[in-house]
Amino acid sequence: MATKIRILPENLTNKIAAGEVVERPASVAKELVENALDAGSKEVVVEIESGGRRLIKVSDTGCGMSRDDALLALERHATSKIATDEDLFSLCTLGFRGEALPSVASVSRLTISTRTSDSVEGTEIYAEGGRIKEVKECGMAVGTVISVRNLFFNTPARLKFMKSAETEGGHVGELLTRLAISRPEVRFTYKNDGKVMFRALDADLKERVATMLGRSISSFLYPVSYQEGGLKVSGLVAAPECSRSAGSHLYTYINGRFIKDKVVQHAILQAYRNFLERGRYPVVAVFIDIAPGEVDVNVHPTKHEVRFREQGRVHDAIQKAVESVLKETPWLKRSAVAAASRPAEKGGGALRPFSSMEASQAALPVTPQPRPALTPGHPDPPPQAQLQQPLVSESRVAEVRELLVNFQPRPQPPLRPQYRGSVAPREGSPYAPIAAAPVPASEPQSAAQDSDHVAAGYFSSLGVIGQFNASYILCQRGTDLILIDQHAAHERVAFEKLKGQFAGREVDSQGLLFPETMEFSFRESAVLREHQAELARLGFEFEEFGGNTWLLKGVPQVLSATRYVDTIRDILEELGSLSRSRAFSDIQEDLLARIACHSVVRGKRTLSPVEIAALFKQMDETDFSSNCPHGRPVMQTLTLAEVEKMFKRI
């Protein structure tokens, strides 16, 4: 009887093994760059073509390999990094399994060129599909150059799952970002289709993080340094205002190895729990140094997950380290120093909002200020330098200029009576109203509307009582008390408006008078480059400025008066999560809802009767007005019976 179990041929086992190690071009780059760092390289250059499908080339200045070692490196489970099973628990290198090169070679056309310092000439090896085809001598500098061409040429099924060149190039860039942050003393260069995407010179950690994640974040980074027994926690943490909508900027390392460990991430999030809203994630680069025997890194093919011997101790140490920095709120001190450095201005006092009307009136004096007359007590005129000093400080001029540039007059309805009359409060009454009672929105608003006999909608028919906590509008309809969340209501109106514009062609965009320069991380920049057309439909107009710097030339009209930078970063996070099974069309409403949410005032705001009436009119013209785009209710109703029950009247 023939056996059903058979030994698989070597070429098939190699492809199966390669499937665990080589998932995409970024996986190849990871293995090769980690080998370069283990070899002591002080400079690493990574070049790709067609997203890595055509070429992945890694050049380093490490120790190189002899001819015999280079040939052995292509054999499975051949490595110089471990020799016994005890070595698995004292690892000081990034690689140790001896699988990388043979796995990559089995699914590509691979060339290795390498030379050691004690060799006159180097060795070049060419392998195709895991089989060595040619070995020869070559001239080169000390180090190693590995070229991987035609990745997955012999595994077409795997080739089908590769994404666009832009996406794959973005994954390679993100991989290099992680490695570059872990080794700030090593120079990194990344080229994509001949174009230099970034070049990171050797520097300290703060400079390296700023290079990789954007200069705008550098002034919001604060050092962490904590030691407890044999456990050391160091690195940088960012202020809460730099937070992201996903955990893509949590750069955590164990003994120099990038990891995505739940214990480590939970400790960091716990430290930030009192500083961030739910669903927001901090920007950190945290390094944990621990005895190799206290952590097992050999628990996952990608080595991104680890297992600690004393999990609770590590968790608590990380949380304490980050909390020790955050509890000092250094970003507030920075703001105070910046405020103190500005010259004091006349009439200064408690901070107050600077209204648009004030901005329009804040012009420089037309006539010069009168100079003091010369008197016997002041025989000499003021020095010439003093006469040439500006009448208004430069910071004040810049502030006014910015307000005038961003000033947009709020559209006002036609003038009309807004109150039936006013009832003077009784003398000495503690319940004096803020303003006279407004006319219910259901009342006729003009003679033109009276002649048209326009029937008021549900919201416009409500009798407005007032506002509670500058966040909720209290209304009455019959004997019912109705509470309306003004933020949720405004958000629904903005969302439906955006959805209508997007269905037509694109969201109305507001051009910026002065384009804003924005620096992104490599991952964000790659996502932006790939989805630039979709972002244009959403109202964001970008122009590439070089490297990871972009010019923002237009934003959706609804965002023009808000902080749109955070909105853009959140949208890029959302777009970065797209996969083959999740297209842009699947998340377009989520993105519109995010824009709508960021476009409305989140905090407390006192509304005038005119603004309330305008909001209610828009709500009557809006579909699904009972809920905001995130599903939260816009209104709640309390019947008279429920109110009387509260006071035990029934």
Swiss-Prot record:
Residues 430-444 have a biased composition (Low complexity). Residues 367-384 have a biased composition (Pro residues). The keyword Nucleotide-binding does not apply. Keywords: DNA damage, DNA repair. Residues 358-392, 408-448 are annotated as: Disordered. It holds the Pfam family HATPase_c_3. GO terms for molecular function: ATP binding; ATP hydrolysis activity; ATP-dependent DNA damage sensor activity; mismatched DNA binding. GO terms for biological process: mismatch repair. InterPro entries: DNA_mismatch_repair_CS, DNA_mismatch_repair_MutL, DNA_mismatch_S5_2-like, HATPase_C_sf, MutL/Mlh/PMS, MutL/Mlh/Pms-like, MutL_C, MutL_C_dimsub. Gene3D superfamilies: 3.30.230.10, Histidine kinase-like ATPase, C-terminal domain, MutL, C-terminal domain, dimerisation subdomain, MutL, C-terminal domain, regulatory subdomain. GO terms for cellular component: mismatch repair complex. The keyword Mitochondrion does not apply. NCBIfam families: mutl. This protein is involved in the repair of mismatches in DNA. It is required for dam-dependent methyl-directed DNA mismatch repair. May act as a 'molecular matchmaker', a protein that promotes the formation of a stable complex between two or more DNA-binding proteins in an ATP-dependent manner without itself being part of a final effector complex. Belongs to the DNA mismatch repair MutL/HexB family. This is DNA mismatch repair protein MutL. It comes from Geobacter sp. (strain M21). The lineage of its organism: Bacteria, Pseudomonadati, Thermodesulfobacteriota, Desulfuromonadia, Geobacterales. The gene is mutL.
